[in-house]
Amino acid sequence: LVGSEMCIRDSNSPKDKIVFDVSHQSYVHKMLTGRKNAFLHPEEYDLVSGYTEPQESEHDFFVIGHTSTSVSLATGLAKGRDLTGGNENIIAVIGDGSLSGGEAFEGLDYAAELGTNMIIIVNDNQMSIAENHGGLYRNLKELRDSNGQCECNFFKAMGLDYIYVNDGNDVQALIEAFSKVKDIQHPIVVHINTLKGKGYERAEQDKELSLIHI
């Protein structure tokens, strides 16, 4: 959620375009772009979609309900910007769980090929629906354990620039990271290590507790 807030804080939406993977990551984005009442008042719950929705707001660019799509969609926006001489930031937000999808790999590959402004925010909380497994996740762990400094770096190997934020729940650390990459003229991955459920003790103690009914 903090990452979503920082995207809005340090971007000029809707000129700068933010694409959220799956769409549930976009709820704070919706709250900060004029739609908060739909989350606060039961009589207004049906006024917004559960997904990003261009017909609902100029801050939304796609109807997104599937995983692993944000990076590829953002590369399309970046290509369109470049063809029309634009200069806005294109930002893709994706979780580590979604990185295992093939379309995410395709998007990363094409972002490197474009070589122009694109900011790819990887929210790494070490969880998908359950724990992550596989070679990619071993490398993400190596990056976390080395504070982003290990020689083997999946993102750099694909031709992308890279910075690491060790405490992605630290608002000031996020502000500093986003200020460094705003208006950058090449594709860069901002790898953010976060704790899922930070601030709610039950969620912090049970990493598979992604939804709590009280």
Give residue ranges: language-model regions.
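Glycine-rich beta-alpha junction loops
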Residues: 24, 125-127, 169, 194-199
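Cofactor-binding active-site loop characterized by glycine-rich and histidine/acidic residues
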Residues: 4-5, 9-114
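Short acidic, glycine/serine/threonine-rich loops at helix termini
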Residues: 28-34, 99-108, 130-135, 141, ...
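Conserved thiamine diphosphate
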Residues: 79-89, 134-177
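Short beta-strand segments
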Residues: 19-22, 93-94, 119-123, 191-196
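Mobile "lid/hinge" segments at catalytic clefts and subdomain interfaces of large enzymes
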Residues: 112-137, 143-145
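Terminal amphipathic helices with adjacent charged low-complexity linkers/tails
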Residues: 172-211
